[in-house]
UniProtKB/Swiss-Prot annotation:
A motif ('KMSKS' region) lies at residues 343-347. The gene is metG. ATP binds at K346. CDD domains: Anticodon_Ia_Met, MetRS_core, tRNA_bind_EcMetRS_like. GO terms for molecular function: ATP binding; metal ion binding; methionine-tRNA ligase activity; tRNA binding. The lineage of its organism: Bacteria, Pseudomonadati, Pseudomonadota, Gammaproteobacteria, Moraxellales. This is Methionine--tRNA ligase. GO terms for biological process: methionyl-tRNA aminoacylation. Belongs to the class-I aminoacyl-tRNA synthetase family. MetG type 1 subfamily. Homodimer. Its main location: cytoplasm. SUPFAM superfamilies: Anticodon-binding domain of a subclass of class I aminoacyl-tRNA synthetases, Methionyl-tRNA synthetase (MetRS), Zn-domain, Nucleic acid-binding proteins, Nucleotidylyl transferase. Zn(2+) binds at C142, C145, C155, C158.
């Protein structure tokens, strides 16, 4: 029996859970349940990520303490996870004594080995709010192209990256005040000292997905930098211990103590389980799972989003190795969620909160749909509402549940719920049993979409068998009563096997199926067992079809969520940003039609797409725009795409912009994308029928 500890990334305690979050928690939960079903001892822990400036500011805006703020959000998160059947063994908070003790211990060990250094850092400071400003709280004019209202790290217009101190006419988005430069002593974790270790660690077989490992090699080539692990007061978090007396308090940056939260949640669970004799909740040893000398005894896996690979595959293993703790056995990254082919949108009603979805639709619908889309690759998945409705209705209602519903009626009506004493089709049942090995392997390898396809193939065989035997016709013929019972017994047994295979994805459905089948066990090992001479209970509908009206109501409610729940903090930030604008700017929200017609949008095809050496946010494109010579375009989308993802794609390019000289060359156009450069950009691609060189009108 393998001993496995599993974590999901910690949701930030600053707002509700939405469907984008749920991709990860559903993926992890399915994997955990699948491994538990195969009799492994698996422990799944998580916690709220409860520190940082954003939480401090939101609490202030809401008129509560940070502790009250995070307690309210934690309760909301736990309620949402419960609705979606996420089966944590423990759900904790990074604002805990366990996390404080472990964070301080790791820091002290790193410091004791000389892995911590200090240096003075010049930062922008908000004189009205009395705090140093992170890049996201500073806006101004791009130092390269002059575009207004650009964030403090990169320009959304020309793609240039820069330091916040380089912005022209900067202002604080928190107060509207003009920030001033101040110097502060910061503490750094010397990541370059672990470069040799990390180069090997990231190449170890099974540690990372190949695409992630390849991405990390690029970062190694660019050179690792020391990591700033401190923040100045005021800050909601843990004070850094052992700082020189008389110096201002320093706090751990949220990304230092957040991953330590995995350890803290597990340690908290170990305390809860101390002395336990319950085999379902066994006693656990913290040291067995976290000490370096025990890393071959137990396994540790992190499920994360692709946007936080840098922290989990570089900083985190280096911190652990430098403080005498074991490193993860594997770090598994997933892509982002798209809805109807686009980034989630509040205005379109596709930025859907977990609570809103559960109000209108069975959460297990989403669990199945995500499972049907997820693979072991780092790929975005698309929740297409039409496909979602069709797949759930066809696969789950029309195929799987239909096997039971079309057979159970005969068994109840004609045989008082009793199944046949023998199996009329042993080879068919054995075929379904044999499929279990491949399904189990697909689950373990996180190839959930493959597992769902294999399960649906089994369901198809069951329905084909029923259709070929036609028990409804047999039932009308005198003397064929035994045949009807035999056919329905085979169907019910296949249904039982399918419930074994679907249990990790649909735990509530399988619990209801247990009640119908009058059994207690649907573990993976039980797939060999047959229900013969066994009495089942009266069938009740196990899953309802999705109606378009339910989806429409959910989307409408999501739009109302946008209108009804703007946070006080969001209002304050919006007002602060507006304070720096002139009345003229506020009156110029509209442009003339003639101005719009000046923009030349052209169908372009990507001939080449490459990384830009020395630019961590740019991709370089060679585009065919239907003219004699292709054009060169730089686009700030590197963190959202690998070059090969865009090869040969047809895109929209603004082709009458004045060429812009940049550090890396001349950009002769602009590729159109949708979304937020902070969280995810989606390049707008066109169907093959669009002709290169055509203009959009």
């Amino acid at each position: 029996m393998r001993q496995i500890l599993v974590t999901s990334a910690l949701p930030y305690a600053n707002g509700p859970i939405h469907l984008g979050h749920l991709v990860e928690y559903i993926q992890t939960d399915i994997w955990v349940r699948a491994m538990k079903a195969q009799s492994h001892q698996v422990t799944y822990v998580c916690a709220d990520d409860a520190h940082g400036t954003a939480i401090m500011l939101k609490a202030e805006a809401n008129g509560v303490t940070p502790e009250q703020q995070i307690a309210t959000v934690k309760a909301s998160h736990e309620a949402d996870f419960s609705k979606f059947l996420i089966g944590f063994d423990n759900y904790h908070s990074t604002h805990s004594e366990e996390n404080r003790e472990l964070s301080e211990l790791i820091y002290r060990r790193l410091n004791g080995e000389g892995h911590i250094s200090t240096k003075d850092v010049e930062q922008l400071f908000d004189p009205e709010k009395g705090l140093f400003l992170a890049d996201r709280f500073v806006k101004g004019e791009c130092p390269e192209c002059g575009a207004q209202d650009q964030y403090g790290d990169n320009c959304e217009v020309c793609g240039t990256t820069y330091n916040a101190t380089e912005l022209k006419n900067p202002y604080s988005t928190l107060s509207g005040a003009t920030p001033v430069l101040r110097t502060s002593k910061h503490y750094f974790f010397n990541l370059p000292e672990f470069e040799s270790f990390l180069k090997q660690w990231t190449k170890d077989e099974g540690r990372l997905q190949p695409s992630v490992s390849n991405k990390l090699q690029e970062w190694f080539e660019a050179g690792l930098a020391s990591w700033d692990i401190s923040r100045d007061a005021p800050y909601f978090g843990f004070k850094i211990p052992d700082t020189p007396e008389g110096e201002p308090d320093k706090y751990f940056y949220v990304w230092l103590d957040a991953p330590v939260g995995y350890m803290a949640s597990f340690k908290n669970l170990c305390k809860q389980r101390q002395g336990s004799t319950d085999p379902q909740q066994p006693e656990l040893s913290f040291d067995d799972y976290w000490l370096q000398e025990n890393q071959h005894k137990t396994e540790l896996y992190h499920f994360i989003g692709k946007d936080i690979v840098y922290f989990h595959a570089l900083f985190w293993p280096a911190m652990l190795a430098g403080s005498e703790y074991r490193t993860p056995t594997g770090v598994f990254a997933h892509g982002f969620l798209m809805v109807n082919g686009d980034k989630m949108s509040k205005s379109r009603g596709t930025f859907i909160q977990a609570e809103t979805f559960a109000k209108h639709l069975n959460p297990e619908y989403l669990r199945y749909y995500f499972a049907s889309k997820l693979s072991e690759k780092v790929e975005d998945i698309n929740l297409d509402f039409a496909d979602f409705m069709q797949k759930v209705n066809s696969d789950m209602v029309g195929k799987v549940v239909n096997i039971a519903s079309r057979s159970a009626g005969f068994i109840a009506k004609k045989y008082d719920g009793m199944l046949s004493d023998s199996c009329a089709e042993p080879e068919l049942l054995n075929e379904i049993v044999r499929a279990g090995e491949e399904i189990a392997t697909a689950y373990e390898n996180r190839e959930f979409s493959r597992a769902m396809r294999l399960i649906m193939q089994c369901a198809d065989k069951a329905n084909e068998y029923i259709d070929s035997k036609k028990p409804w016709a047999m039932a009308k013929e005198e003397g064929r009563e035994q045949e009807v019972q035999d056919v329905c017994t085979v169907a019910i047994n296949i249904f039982r096997q399918l419930m074994v295979y679907l249990a990790p994805v649909l735990p509530e459905l399988t619990d209801n199926a247990k009640a119908f089948l009058n059994i207690d066990d649907l573990s993976f090992a039980s797939r060999h067992e047959l229900l013969l001479g066994h009495k089942i209970n009266k069938f009740k509908p196990l899953m309802q079809r999705i109606e378009q009206a339910q989806i429409d109501a959910m989307v409408a409610d999501s739009k109302q969520d946008l209108l009804a729940t703007p946070t006080a903090q969001a209002d304050n930030v919006a007002k602060a940003a507006q304070a720096s604008e002139t009345n003229d700017q506020q009156d110029s929200d509209y442009i003339e039609f003639d101005d719009f017609m000046k923009v030349e949008m052209t169908v372009a095809q990507v001939l080449e797409c490459n990384h830009v050496e020395g630019a961590d946010k740019l991709l370089q494109f060679t585009l065919d725009i239907g003219k004699e010579q292709p054009i060169n375009v730089f686009s700030g989308i590197r963190k959202f795409y690998e070059p090969e993802q865009l090869a040969n794609k047809k895109v929209i390019c603004v082709t009458n912009l004045a060429p812009r000289k940049m550090k890396f060359g001349v950009s002769e156009g602009m590729i159109l994308s949708s979304g937020d450069p902070k969280t995810g950009l989606v390049v707008i691609t066109l169907p093959d029928e669009c002709k290169v060189g055509d203009k959009l009108a």
